[in-house]
Amino acid sequence: MTLHDLLLSGHPTTSRIVLPMLVEEYHVGQLWSVAQASKNETGGGEGVEVLVNEPFDETHHVPMPKLQAAGKEFTVGQYTHKVYHLSSKVPGFVRLLAPKGSLEIHEMAWNAYPYCRTIITNPDYMKDNLYIIIESYHAPDNGCTPNIHGLQGRDLSARQVVKIDIANDKVAAKDYKPEWDPCLVASPKAGRNPLPRDKTGEWMNHAKPVMCCYKLVKVWFKWFGLQKRMESFILNVEQRLFLNFHRQVVCWLDNYYDMTMDDIRRLEAEVKEELDRQRTEGQVRGTVATDKDEEQ
């Protein structure tokens, strides 16, 4: 199966993540938070390596097929290519089967905000047998747009929709920190209070400002005897990462509230050097695969 075939097929899962912020704020906040989260996940021989971070257009780092969402086409933005050096961040049964050095995941992203396509592969070991495609669109609504990615036919009928509530969804005990809890953390700079812990998600109907991250995820994993198990594991991990990351984005708002995109590009250059040092030092940090990711 080619990448183009996968983009047009598969069994998609759509996550809708409502946030109490402006779409413009999230543009800066997402990038700031990715840089911070990369530092939190890097150490002890594992973590993030940034290979490329530069603009793309219709002649350089051209995405194929074209970037399209919400009835629009996107032709310019920022291209990144990262390598994730993993071991403890994958399930135990994969570590037993995979040879040393095979647990390196490549992530290529075309960020044409408010749209972004991310492609995750394992070219050295799985080759064309692993693709994770994430297509993200960021809209100024509360998750009410029914089909923002323009799915049709079988894709639309087979789609699973997951609404992630950053205030009330259960967070794994090992992931929880009070400073990453949007029900406890306010933003004095933006003048925003903590979110209510109402169990119903009613806050999403009243939040001002409000926006939604619409994430369409497709997984292709071809490994005899493990396909369904690994595809399920990957989707569970993605939901866990979406929940944790977006709670952090909201709680970190004061850190990036006054920043510009020029500030972000300078920060990314500094973080790249820090990651290169940090990856070879200390202990493994951040998210570690758990048995529950396999069971859910």
Task: Locate the predicted segments by residue.
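Eukaryotic helix-grip
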Residues: T2-Q296
